[in-house]
Regions:
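Alpha-helical segments in transporter systems
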Residues: 20, 39-42, 50-75, 106, ...
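Transmembrane helices of ABC transporter permease
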Residues: 47, 51-64, 75, 176-230, ...
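An intracellular "coupling" helix at the cytosolic face of ABC transporter transmembrane type-1 domains
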Residues: 47, 148-149, 167-174, 178, ...
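Helix-loop-helix
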Residues: 83, 194-208, 222, 278-351, ...
Length: 618
């Protein structure tokens, strides 16, 4: 960190444990655009105006009831003192009836203050939770429309951190900061008025401490800011490492990379710990220094108050009340320092949430088309595409798929096969040329309608934590149990399902690790069969199953592809011998095109690939 040399703060000894000793502490991080972020947040708060105004009113009432207390208590002290003096002089006695009634009134004031504070807290908790609920809901909806390119530039851990940690920080900080801000300002004004009503000289002594407090706040915030800025970002990186290590734990163990993984985590964890420790160390100095200033105010009040009492310009009750007010005056000033840190943290977390919500969405034309004719005719016309502007993957790709045809795409790893499928699904838009379905450019299609016409089976299976029945039904939620089981039989997975405990009600765990890779693939194929979409995308769907299972799947696939336009990316070339057209891709270009027999007869790149696979098998 470049800023570390600016302020010499000793590096703390790192504490082991999750995220070091500091854990996930992020308080005090400064937002890049504090004012802009707060304006956006006010838009969310404005949705709950009545509740917020009511909370403010109850907070003000609570403070007012609390502020009046020392004044009343001072009157009781004066009355008691005067009564005792009169009793000693034999001219009177202590008026305990008046004192009892006054103390009863004081008790009612404090009870009313507590009730108002309780109601205010209940209202603000409701407001903050509703705001967090709305933000999480908007984030969930946003994920569905954010382009794939966004996730290429952001780790899963970073996105999850925005959804969980940042929203939680917002909720906690908003509730705390709004309450403290309202009560602190109200208390400062109210206490100042009460102190002026008691003694102008004593008030002047107390107010003299404000410039010192302001200087301390400014200096501490200034020096702590450099260490606040990276905390939220580093936390996202830490979460990303944790998510990645958890998902790839088997690979880490197999390749004995646990130590390297721990070292990388420790490196990021050290950054989070050091920046968090230093920022909190500096901001933590604020309270002791503010207490020092407050104590100096006490000393000044005692000295001046004693002089006023000796000259008869102040009563003992006045001095006692004023000392209480001095404490009530310095406390909210200190709280404003905490509010400053809390609001900086809140703004930083909120800014990250708003950054995600403001991320570019997948373009959707207002007049997007939903063609009545089901897709079957697909045409790539001189398509050019690259994930980044400086690296083109697809250079000049052209091909045409007639309705019901099976188009097989083969080629070495990195040739651009899967990229073509992503373009067809419009996860990305082409950089040049056009891609048309039923004669309509996919950029003019309604995205949901376009994707809803394709069933997909990918090499990387995705199953969620639910029963096998519900995982298959995911392809068509309204399907009956009989239809689910029919799809499973077509995918040749009915037999192994019945061997599991519970059969179709067998619960798949997270990541689907209680099924074999081949079994998971069969379930995803059954899901695609049940979906019964007019077009199919099979991305090396049989590459993770054994030869016997592959034969079973292939027979099911042959029947499934009848009458449907199918795009098949194949690793095992033996599975695409019956394809209507085989496209051989290398470096983003078509180098060969034809049927299986035609390409073998040519003796080119495809023939070499095909023969090499059989040579390896032999």
């Amino acid at each position: 960190m470049a800023d570390e040399t600016k302020t010499q703060i000793p590096k703390p000894t790192r504490q082991r444990g999750p995220m070091g000793r500091m854990g996930g502490m992020r308080r005090g991080e400064k937002a890049k655009d504090f004012k802009g972020t707060m304006r956006q947040l006010l838009g969310y708060i404005g949705q709950h105006k009545i509740a917020v105004f009511a909370a403010v009113a109850f907070a003000v009432c609570s403070v007012i009831f609390n502020i009046v207390g020392p004044k009343v208590l001072g009157q009781v002290t004066t009355k008691l003192f005067e009564g005792l003096v009169a009793k000693v002089n034999g001219t009177g006695d202590v008026d305990f009836d008046w004192i009892a009634k006054t103390l009863g009134f004081l008790l009612c004031l404090y009870l009313a203050s507590s009730v108002c504070s309780l109601i205010q807290g209940w209202l603000m908790t409701g407001v903050t939770q509703k705001i967090c609920y709305r933000m999480r809901k908007e984030i969930a909806a946003k994920i569905a429309v954010v382009p794939m390119s966004y996730f290429n530039g952001h780790s899963k851990g970073d996105v999850l951190s925005r959804i969980t940690n940042d929203v939680d920080t917002l909720g906690q900080s908003l509730n705390q900061s709004v309450t403290q801000l309202i009560t602190s300002v109200t208390q400062i004004i109210g206490v100042l008025v009460m102190m002026l009503s008691i003694s102008l000289p004593l008030t002047g002594v107390t107010v003299l401490t404000l410039p010192a407090a302001a200087i301390i706040l400014t200096v501490m915030i200034h020096f702590s800011q450099p260490y606040f800025r990276e905390q939220q970002q580093v936390l996202g990186a830490v979460n990303g490492i944790i998510e990645e290590d958890f998902a790839g734990q088997n690979v880490i163990q197999v390749f004995d990379r646990a130590e390297a993984s721990i070292e990388e985590f420790d490196r990021q964890n050290d950054r989070l710990f050091i920046s968090g420790w230093r920022s909190q160390f500096l901001s933590g100095l604020m309270m002791p220094l503010m207490s020092l200033v407050g104590n100096m105010g006490y000393v000044g009040v005692v000295v001046v108050g004693a002089q006023l009492a000796l000259t008869g310009n102040a009563t003992p009750g006045d001095i006692q009340s004023f000392i209480q007010y001095v404490r009530n005056f310095t406390q909210p000033v200190q709280q404003l320092g905490n509010v400053s840190n809390t609001m900086q943290s809140m703004a930083a977390a909120t800014e990250r949430v708003f950054e995600f919500l403001a991320a570019p969405e997948e373009e959707q034309k207002a007049d997007a088309q939903i063609p009545e004719k089901r897709p079957g005719h697909v045409e790539f016309d001189h398509v050019k595409f690259g994930y980044t502007p400086d690296k083109t993957i697809i250079h000049d790709f052209s091909c045409e798929a007639q309705p019901g045809q099976t188009i097989a795409i083969v080629g070495p790893t990195g040739a651009g096969k899967t990229t073509l499928i992503k373009l067809l699904q419009r996860f990305y838009d082409v950089d040049g040329g056009s891609l048309r379905v039923e004669g309509v450019d996919v950029r003019d299609w309604d995205r949901a309608a376009l994707r809803g016409e394709f069933a997909m089976v990918l090499q990387d299976t995705w199953l969620f934590n639910d029963t096998i029945r519900e995982n298959i039904r995911y392809g068509r939620p309204d399907a009956t149990d009989a239809e689910v089981e029919a799809a499973a039989r077509a995918a040749r997975c009915d037999h192994f399902i019945h061997t599991l405990a519970g059969g179709y009600d067998f619960m798949i765990n997270e990541e689907g690790t209680n099924l074999s890779q081949g079994q998971r693939q069969l379930v995803t194929i059954a899901r695609a069969i049940l979906a019964d979409r007019p077009a199919l995308i099979l991305d090396e769907a049989t590459s993770n199953v054994d030869t016997r299972t592959e034969e079973l799947i292939q027979r099911a696939m042959d029947a499934l592809m009848q009458g449907r336009t199918s795009f098949v990316i194949a690793h095992r070339l033996s599975t695409i011998r019956n394809a209507d057209v085989i496209l051989v891709i290398r470096d983003g270009d078509i180098v060969e095109k034809g049927t299986h027999d035609e390409l073998l007869a040519q003796g080119g790149f495809y023939a070499d690939l095909y023969n090499s696979q059989f040579d390896e098998a032999a």
